[in-house]
């Protein structure tokens, strides 16, 4: 529940997310996007049809998600120098290190990880559709559109089918699922020491404005 109802997500969905926070998030998530996990997943896929499905989705990400990042980083005047100089947040580093640690793990563990990640994105994007809300900020609407719709629902459905086929609640992949939920939650919001949630990107804002 917390992973899809963070402050960041809620404010993105209702168009109250500060531009400086979104700008910092785009930098962090694009760095995260380039972690190579899809390539590892395709390599381990047990059937050719599964490899083909994953490869097609990887190309879709390149054509749509990467294009989204590039467009809005440019729209928010993020230079290549600024992008390269921005260090990952602690939560991003932790998440990336965990995904790197999965590189030599089994197919069930990897497919569970990607399924959990994508399912969470669909779940929070679906919140805005269920509420019949359309974002007016182009970057907000674009991000929701990428993660809600017939194509993305089918993608997540295919992943769930693969998890049901290859994974077990008694296997190590169960811990992978729990860990991904925890890391996704940390990626979007970190609790403040004395009260309300704060964004994990807040420490970067002074460098981005």
Task: Pin down the residues of each PLM region.
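A non-catalytic, amphipathic alpha-helix used as a structural packing/dimerization or gating element
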Residues: 24-32, 56, 60, 175-186
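Acidic, low-complexity proline/glycine-rich segments
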Residues: 1-9, 149-158
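Long hydrophobic alpha-helical segments typical of transmembrane helices together
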Residues: 165-208
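Short, charged/polar, low-complexity loop and linker segments
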Residues: 9-14, 99-100, 163-168
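Alpha-helical bundle segments that constitute or directly flank the non-heme di-iron/ferroxidase center
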Residues: 2, 16-44, 111-123, 188
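Extended amphipathic alpha-helical scaffold segments
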Residues: 3-4, 34-39, 67, 156-163
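Active-site-proximal alpha-helical scaffolds that flank and shape metal-associated catalytic sites
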Residues: 50-155, 178, 182, 200, ...
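Helix-loop segments that flank and shape redox-cofactor active sites
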Residues: 7-20, 34-55, 103
């Amino acid at each position: 529940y917390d992973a899809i109802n963070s402050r960041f997500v809620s404010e993105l969905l209702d168009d109250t997310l500060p531009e400086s926070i979104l700008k910092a998030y785009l930098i962090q998530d694009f760095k995260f996007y380039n972690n190579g996990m899809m390539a590892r997943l395709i390599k381990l896929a047990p059937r050719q049809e599964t490899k083909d499905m994953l490869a097609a989705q990887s190309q879709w990400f390149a054509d749509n998600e990467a294009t989204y990042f590039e467009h809005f980083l440019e729209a928010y005047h993020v230079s290549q120098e600024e992008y390269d100089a921005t260090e990952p947040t602690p939560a991003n580093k932790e998440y990336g290190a965990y995904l790197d640690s999965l590189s030599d793990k089994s197919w069930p563990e990897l497919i569970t990880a990607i399924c959990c990640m994508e399912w969470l994105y669909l779940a929070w994007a679906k919140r805005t559709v269920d509420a019949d809300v359309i974002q007016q900020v182009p970057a907000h609407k674009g991000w929701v559109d990428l993660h809600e719709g017939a194509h993305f629902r089918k993608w997540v459905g295919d992943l769930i089918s693969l998890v049901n086929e290859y994974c077990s609640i008694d296997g190590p992949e169960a811990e992978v699922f729990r860990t991904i939920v925890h890391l996704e939650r940390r990626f979007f919001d970190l609790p403040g020491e004395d009260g309300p949630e704060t964004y994990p990107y807040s420490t970067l804002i002074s460098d981005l404005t």
